[in-house]
Amino acid sequence: MTKSDGQGREERKALQRARILEAAREIFFRDGFMAANLDEVALSAGVAKGTLYRYFESKGDLYVALLAENGRAFEERMREVADAPGSASERIRKLGRFYFDHWTRNHTYFQIFWALENPAVTGDLPKQAVAAVIRLWEDCLRILADVIRGGVESGEFGPCDTWEVANILWTVANGLLQTEQAGPRRALLGAKTPEQAFHDMVELFLRGLAAPSR
């Protein structure tokens, strides 16, 4: 086999994998993780089901690969928002608006993203696939932690464990997004909309981070 033959084969494999991911994206987003059918994914991608399994060991593996691919685009956009001019507080507010707007517009994607934490839903996933998504989470958290660290270094925020604070803010933000999608839990917010509650949460965090006045 010549070098060009090998390159052609690799290109075909890459295109085939891309078609499977594109078909999975449409079906996962339409039906959700639990209802998504791999027979339909294979049919939509124009491949045999056995071919699909050569690339992805299970539905969970396919789901994680899809998240990792799309998550990188989210990370790049988040980094752009974080790098915008302004104080640390202003940039955290912008990140909050971006995060809320992105996930409320892509709520199905949010649901399957966090299904990773429920093995009963996803089944046993390959460690390498899970590691790819964990790296994505860590990279996004690092963006937020870096903004907080900049605020500490400038004296805008008081001293704190910036990684811990980023994790807490991230966790609370995701809890509010889950509330936004759950009818009974939304009622607990009273007259406030989920967006208002999310905004208030960010402001409370910023108050807690603010350096004591001298």
Predicted regions, residues:
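Hydrophobic alpha-helical connector segments
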Residues: 65, 69, 79-109, 165-169, ...
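Short hydrophobic/aromatic patch on the recognition helix
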Residues: 46-56
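Short coil/turn segments at alpha/beta junctions that flank glycine-rich nucleotide-binding fingerprints
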Residues: 30-34, 85, 106, 154
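C-terminal peripheral helix-coil segments that are non-catalytic and often amphipathic
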Residues: 1-4, 98-105, 138-154, 167, ...
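Amphipathic, non-transmembrane alpha-helical scaffold segments
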Residues: 13, 63, 67, 71, ...
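Basic, helix-initiating cap at the start of DNA-binding domains
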Residues: 1-31, 35-44, 61-64
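Short, Lys/Arg-enriched C-terminal cap helix and immediately downstream tail that follows
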Residues: 64-65, 75, 177
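Short secondary-structure transition hinges
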Residues: 101-146, 153-156, 163-164
